[in-house]
Amino acid sequence: MYFKKKYIGLIDKNCEKKILDDSSTIKICYILIGILIGTNMITLIYNFIFWDNYIKCYRNNDKMFYCPNDWVGYNNICYYFSNGSFSKNYTAASNFCRQLNGTLANNDTNLLNLTKIYNNQSMYWVNNTVILRGDNKYSQKVNYTDLLFICGK
């Protein structure tokens, strides 16, 4: 039957063909599978032991951080930009940011650069001041003006 089959394979030193039966073929398959599993296990163990070498941010020793959905990560801070139809006055914007466990973003150079990258077509509330359209400037505004806003955390 099936186990009685013989296969021609491997050549001996005298260049004569050897005949392999099913059991020797299966043994060779088991050996190859064992070698593959063994090398995978060694690789996994090595990676587990030396994992710290793989997770590094080399620029300024930054640490990895994650932001919630709809937030933008920049310089280890998460920012929420309100969209075009979602403008509020200063007090309402500040309260909304608190509901998101954040505050109105502080006005600094990093945020100014981010607004130029992210969206330079609007004015945003940030910490009781406003980032002007497309300019590298801040301007004081009255608190009741409805504008877009940026939360940070």
Curated annotation (Swiss-Prot):
It is found in: Host endoplasmic reticulum membrane. Residues 52-153 are extracellular. GO terms for molecular function: carbohydrate binding. The keyword Disulfide bond applies. Keywords: Disulfide bond, Early protein, Glycoprotein, Host endoplasmic reticulum, Host membrane, Host-virus interaction, Lectin, Membrane, Modulation of host cell apoptosis by virus, Signal-anchor, Transmembrane, Transmembrane helix. SUPFAM superfamilies: C-type lectin-like. Glycans are attached at residues 83, 89, 101, 107, 113, 120, 127, 143. Its main location: host cell. It is a single-pass type II membrane protein. Residues 1-30 are cytoplasmic. Disulfide bonds join 67-78, 97-151. GO terms for biological process: symbiont-mediated perturbation of host apoptosis. The chain crosses the membrane at residues 31-51. One of its GO terms (cellular component) is membrane. Induction: Expressed in the early phase of the viral replicative cycle. Expressed in the late phase of the viral replicative cycle. Belongs to the asfivirus lectin-like protein family. Down-regulates MHC-I expression by impairing the appropriate configuration or presentation into the plasma membrane of the latter. Participates in viral hemadsorption, which may help viral spread. Reduces the transactivating activity of host TP53, thus inhibiting apoptosis. Non-essential for virus growth in swine macrophage cell cultures. Homodimer. This is Lectin-like protein EP153R. It comes from African swine fever virus (strain Badajoz 1971 Vero-adapted) (Ba71V).
